[in-house]
Amino acid sequence: MLGVVLLYVGVVLILNGIARLCNVDEKSMAVFNVFTGALSFILNIVAVIQGNYFAAGTGLLFGFTYLFIAARCIFNLDGRLYGWYCLFVAINTIPLAFIDPTTLKFIDFTVGNIYWVIIWLLWGLLWLTGFIELVMKKNLGKFVGYLSVIDGIFTAWIPGFLLLINMFPK
């Protein structure tokens, strides 16, 4: 299930980054955020039903992110509360980077686990930019767009695809 969600997280991060870099209309940007947010939400509710609470808890951080982005874009909402949510998630990415989701213990430093450390920390950096821009009111310019595209490719699309074909490093 993770590979499926990551594939769509990858494309939505890429599209959100391109939208920012190319000044695409926010309502247009909202559409894929609704799709990805809904997919993530539904699949993570399934994970809760199956008793996989760690996967669901971490996965819903993404689902709510994209649903909130979509709502902000469609309804032109004040972004400050979303910015505080971004800080909450960014802080959580620090310990999550070092927890093995299969054992719920501190990771062994295998190649696959080191990739997950880097992936979680890069996601945390992107969420932190939401707090910096929306709460602290510091415009980070094109950096966020480029970071979103890079995160989309290297932390979601490629890992998601590798998970789907069972080739992600252990």
Regions of interest found by a model, annotated:
Residues 14-19, 38-50, 66-73, 91-104, ...:
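Hydrophobic alpha-helical transmembrane segments and adjacent interfacial helices
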Residues 19-23, 48, 55, 109, ...:
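Generic alpha-helix detector with strongest preference for long hydrophobic helices that associate
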Residues 3, 7, 16, 29, ...:
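Generic detector of bulky aromatic hydrophobic side chains
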